[in-house]
Amino acid sequence: MAKELPEHFARHGANLILLDISPEIEKLADELCGRGHRCTAVVADVRDPASVAAAIKRAKEKEGRIDILVNNAGVCRLGSFLDMSDEDRDFHIDINIKGVWNVTKAVLPEMIARKDGRIVMMSSVTGDMVADPGETAYALTKAAIVGLTKSLAVEYAQSGIRVNAICPGYVRTPMAESIARQSNPEDPESVLTEMAKAIPMRRLADPLEVGELAAFLASDESSYLTGTQNVIDGGSTLPETVSVGI
């Protein structure tokens, strides 16, 4: 959703700061600017607090301030618990937890000083609500984001900061496609088809649907929401078990 979320916020009139480890993010910024949106790209590694702090400093020098933070960086590598290496475990933790921690810590002080700020965390139904074989490290990190969301919401509510989490099910994104390729390299599309069959709405989410939820949580229309888990999964967490009936 690294492309769709910025596009959605831009359509709502937001001035954008895009932070990514890949210089490719500059192409997306140029594309959005070419459509008349205001957009700044900064290249940084969310695992490195110094890199994040320098990037945020450069962005604020150009844009002035940051009102909304959407923590969307995330990775998922499949592997059974016993087969997963320490490097794979730490890869998830460094990006999915420490990355969120580092960016939030860099942005939050300015929000507190203004007594106004909105933070949207991208978690998942995996981890805190459900689990899939082969996603132990991913589940660990996404459950942690729910805990971080609630803790920050309580700690900084009186400072005018709202913090909410989005918990998607399967979304048709490069990450979902990567999981499908890892699961069945010869026919990844069949994996995505089977994913959809297990969802009551019989389809994966469109990234723009998640973007609409993120925009709502970042807007004044959600002014009394903080510390919430917002599930957007087409009903996939509702069935007690796989249906054997109609």
Locate predicted features.
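Residue(s) in the substrate-gating loop at a strand-loop-helix junction
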Residues: 124
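The beta1-alpha1 cofactor-binding region of Rossmann-like NAD(H)/NADP(H)-dependent oxidoreductases
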Residues: 43-55, 86, 208-209
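Substrate-binding pocket helix/loop in short-chain dehydrogenase/reductase
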Residues: 80-81, 88-93, 195
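Short C-terminal tail/terminal secondary-structure segment
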Residues: 226-246
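Alpha-helical segment proximal to the catalytic Tyr-Lys
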Residues: 109, 154-158, 223
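Canonical Rossmann dinucleotide-binding motif of NAD(H)/NADP(H)-dependent dehydrogenases/reductases
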Residues: 1-17
